[in-house]
Amino acid sequence: MKDVFIIAFSAYGGPNMHLALYQKRLVEEKKYLTTEQLMEYFSLCQMLPGPSSTQTLMSIGYQFGGRVLAFLTLLVWVLPAFILLTITAIFIGAFQDQALGYLRFVQPVAVGFVIVAGVKMVKKSVKNRQGYLLATMAFVVTALLRYPLDTWVNMKTPWMFPIVLVTAGLFSFFDFKGTVQKYKPIKIKFPWRSLVTFVVIFILAGVLGKVSSNPLVILFENCYRFGTIVFGGGNVLIPMMLEQFTNHISNGASEPFMTTGEFLNGVGLVQAIPGPIFTIASFT
């Protein structure tokens, strides 16, 4: 836990930087696990929705202490960023005009962070013609056609992103022409109870979030949905949250949760604070 706490206070730069810190502290210095084990955990977590670096750290905790240590690892990992962002959000809420004045230069910096993150993700993930085609399609639909689609088919909703993701996933599945490496099957006891619980909560949260006007219920549904459908790290989460919290008006509300300026302040601050980018949820 001490090592995780130390890493949490020096974890700038996103998942790849976090992985380098894990390698240095947990593998090379403490020798808790090997480089091969670390990369296996990270590769597996890359295929799962949610924050890959956080899930990797939780997997290491689970290896040594089961569910309890995995949960405590998560708590220690996100606590510093959570506390700092929560205090900042309270400060902005209490001193609205003055706080926004102090943070007026954070917004353009935050836009720069988002652009750089987008360029890095394109360089890392788009490597062939099909990839460029899918990236272009996603950009056109979510950025250029958002308002025309809103007029025609009511597509200006948070569900635009999962629809694009599912479409791209199906295209990639049917277009795959590579070879699958042989593997030695192993017998495991699959935790069906956990999977069923996860699906039931997802469905109930979606239904309650649609019919309820309670902001806490709606916020829970939003964050649970984000964690379920986000692949690729915290930077992918930012445009989804921007659409949900600044453009979408929830049931019983007269305006969005926050303004674009307030959200960009949060984006800039989370980049300046150690820890996972997903902790921006505490700011919102």
What is the role of each PLM region?
Residues 1-48, 59-284:
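Multi-pass membrane proteins that catalyze or facilitate reactions on polyprenyl-/lipid-phosphate substrates
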